[in-house]
């Protein structure tokens, strides 16, 4: 354990950079920008209940409108957001550190050779302290919630994905999620299941059903639940 309740199975510098990422949401049909410096403000955080894990913090993370733009329904959608999920307390930890400049990328004068920034220090100092041990599992948790009208009824679709490290092979959950998806897409291209060329979009060009079935064969399952809401 550590005060962050977080260890990294990918690039720690990337985690630090994500704490400064600007976000664009659609709220009540209008685009709303959340600058990176306001990402961890209490007003921008909410809690979600993830099956099997309990309460997690949802923190603004990136341009949600990008996805609705690509799928062609930004003009009709009412609300959309994109969040990182973390254990409770993540935002409260980073909020004061960001305010004090610990994630600035400007070198600090008279510190070493004058080329070291606070971000550099946070990266080099913390990264080796946040490494998983051989008997520890990393977790990948994804939650997607969609609400709309289906067959004349207001409906909510909840899709969840949960991956954990395989201690027998040592393969990290993050590695499994990223690598398996890339391998499946590459095989689809080789087998002509995807005929388009050039830069492709997972949202548009990858056949959903065979892709999800291939993930399932590798132990990665997306669970979907539909429920009818009161009008």
Protein language model regions, located:
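C-terminal catalytic/substrate-binding lobe primarily of soluble NAD(P)-dependent oxidoreductases
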Residues: 1-231
């Amino acid at each position: 354990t550590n005060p962050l309740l977080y260890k990294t199975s990918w690039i720690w510098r990337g985690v630090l950079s994500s704490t400064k990422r600007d976000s664009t949401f659609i709220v009540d049909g209008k685009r709303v920008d959340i600058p990176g410096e306001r990402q961890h403000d209490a007003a921008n955080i909410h809690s979600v209940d993830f099956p099997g894990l309990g309460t997690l913090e949802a923190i603004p993370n990136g341009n949600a409108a990008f996805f609705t733009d690509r799928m062609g329904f930004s003009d009709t959608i009412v609300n959309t957001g994109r969040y990182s999920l973390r254990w409770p307390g993540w935002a409260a930890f980073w909020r004061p550190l960001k305010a004090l400049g610990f994630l600035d990328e400007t070198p600090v004068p008279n510190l070493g050779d004058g080329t070291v920034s606070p971000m550099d220090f946070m990266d080099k100092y913390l990264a080796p302290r946040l490494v998983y041990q051989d008997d520890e599992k990393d977790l990948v948790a994804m939650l997607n919630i969609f609400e709309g009208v289906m067959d004349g009824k207001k409906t909510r679709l909840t899709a969840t994905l949960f991956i954990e490290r395989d201690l027998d092979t040592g393969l990290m959950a993050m590695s499994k999620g990223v690598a398996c998806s890339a391998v499946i897409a590459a095989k689809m291209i080789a087998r002509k299941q995807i005929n388009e060329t050039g830069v492709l979009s997972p949202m548009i060009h990858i056949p959903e059903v065979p892709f999800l079935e291939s993930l399932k064969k590798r132990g990665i399952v997306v669970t979907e639940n539909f429920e009818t809401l009161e009008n």
